[in-house]
A protein has these predicted regions:
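Terminal alpha-helical segments
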Residues: 1-129
Length: 129
C-alpha cells in the first residue's frame, strides 16, 4: 500500500529501481559520470557568468532578459546579445545535459556523456577568454 504523503517522483524512482538490475559497480560508475557532468557544467556556468559581467553593459545577467527567468537561461540570452551565438547554442546543449545528469534519475548517464560535458566546458571556456 502506498502512503498518501509519498511524492509521485519518489514512486517513479522506486519503480525504476525495481525494474533495473544494477550491480554496485555500474551504479557507482554512473554516479561518477553524473558528478563529472555537474562539476563541468557548474565551473562553466561561473566562468561564463563572470565573462558576461566583465564584457557586457549590465551588472546582472538577468538584465539581458525582458521576462523573469532563471540565471541559466538568462546566460544563453546574454551570450546571444553579446554576439556569441555559437557559444549560446553550446551552452543551451550543456544545460540539457546537466539537467539530465542532475535531475532525471531515469536517464542513463554514460562515460560518453561525461566526456561530452568536459568537451563542452573546454570549448565554451576557451572561446570566452
Amino acid at each position: 500500500m502506498v502512503h498518501a504523503f509519498v511524492p509521485p517522483h519518489l514512486l517513479d524512482f522506486a519503480e525504476y529501481i525495481q525494474n533495473q538490475e544494477y550491480s554496485a559497480e555500474h551504479y557507482d560508475l554512473q554516479c561518477i559520470d553524473r558528478t563529472i557532468v555537474n562539476r563541468a557544467y557548474l565551473s562553466t556556468y561561473l566562468h561564463v557568468q563572470e565573462w558576461i559581467l566583465n564584457n557586457g553593459p549590465y551588472n546582472d545577467v538577468k538584465d539581458y532578459c525582458e521576462h523573469d527567468i532563471g540565471y541559466h537561461a538568462a546566460i544563453c540570452i546574454a551570450l546571444n546579445e553579446l554576439n556569441k551565438k555559437a557559444m549560446s547554442k553550446k551552452y543551451a546543449e550543456f544545460i540539457e545535459l546537466r539537467v539530465d545528469a542532475h535531475y532525471n534519475i531515469v536517464t542513463i548517464i554514460t562515460p560518453k556523456d561525461a566526456q561530452k560535458a568536459l568537451d563542452l566546458a573546454f570549448q565554451i571556456q576557451n572561446a570566452l577568454q
